[in-house]
UniProtKB/Swiss-Prot annotation:
Pathway: Carbohydrate degradation; glycolysis; pyruvate from D-glyceraldehyde 3-phosphate: step 2/5. HAMAP family: Phosphoglyc_kinase (MF_00145). Monomer. It is found in: Cytoplasm. Keywords: ATP-binding, Cytoplasm, Glycolysis, Kinase, Nucleotide-binding, Transferase. SUPFAM superfamilies: Phosphoglycerate kinase. PANTHER family: PHOSPHOGLYCERATE KINASE, PHOSPHOGLYCERATE KINASE 1, CHLOROPLASTIC-RELATED. The keyword Ribosomal protein does not apply. Pfam families: PGK. ATP binds at residues 197, 319, 345-348. It comes from Shewanella pealeana (strain ATCC 700345 / ANG-SQ1). This is Phosphoglycerate kinase. One of its GO terms (molecular function) is phosphoglycerate kinase activity.
Amino acid sequence: MTILNMKDLDLQGKRVLIREDLNVPVSDGVVTSDARLRASLPTIKLALEKGAAVMVMSHLGRPTEGEFNAEFSMQPVVDYLTKALDCPVRLAADYLDGIEVAVGEVVVFENVRFNLGEKKNDEALAKKMAALCDVYVMDAFGTAHRAQASTHGVGLHAPIACAGPLLAGELEALGKALDNPARPMVAIVGGSKVSTKLTVLESLSTKVDQLVVGGGIANTFVAAAGHKVGKSLYEADLIEEAQRLVANAQSRGGDIPVPTDVVVAGEFSPTATATLKDVSDVSDTDMIFDIGPDSAEALAEIIKNAGTVVWNGPVGVFEFDQFGEGTKRIAQAIAESNAFSIAGGGDTLAAVDKYGIADKVSYISTGGGAFLEFLEGKELPAVAMLESRGQ
């Protein structure tokens, strides 16, 4: 993979345009979760240290394209960066026809989705963005799976297009986990639906030594094994698909283990009473919300012996503590394991935070959809663009 890296370039006196993923939650004009902003700081600081005039752009939320909407303004991000960078940071609303930026200054462009043509990767818009810079830096792994004007088109037309340290680090870590993994390799795929993760399950099942399913996905596999799932969330039309995945895994000497014990309740609520049952004892009125302690220990043992662990999705409704023990045990096992571990996806990162294991995970991926598409083996448009420009 030949991709230029920003850290290897001479940026002295250069106009550097960085595409970050600064799509953070904002409430009453204040950023409420700054994880993505913190992740972007080293790249912005490095560009400043290298003597660049720095421009930063991102989307924020889902405004109607082509229309200004104060609710989705980048102003709260600018306020945050002003404090975090300890240097002048200004917001620019009108920049497409040219903007003056001084060396040592940071200018944040207003929400890129206020520009008509952003999502469609409009060539005229991309060329205007490209004309603003000497070097374009793609550093937003979270949007690398989208071919849009600010993530893809601009890079085709900029004088130089390179990856930022955050994106480069992400690709390196994911490559290490998927291209040449330390064995045995274990993938834990949770979440509510098999249908949304089917291609991920198929792709991973051919790469890993052990595939583990959790959450609503596991319920479909429980049903596929011939057990009742009561009123649990599951997909009856994908039972044959689940059986095929299990058969494929077994034909390669692996398996997709089904929980032996589960935690059930009669309703989905934070006050629901949790009851532990053997998987064969689930009644018609039960809803499965977590794996039981025996199943959790069996998975912890698999993780303990792994060389590589990829974690995408919780194994239970961990938002409610009485259904969080399974996910908590998985998190602890990953934290205690010597394996190279990667965690990605919004719910997974919330679990990593809740159980305080962030510093024990080898790599935490900033991408949601991009992380999944990488696991599926799909080519990410922004990465393909950087490769074509790196030749």
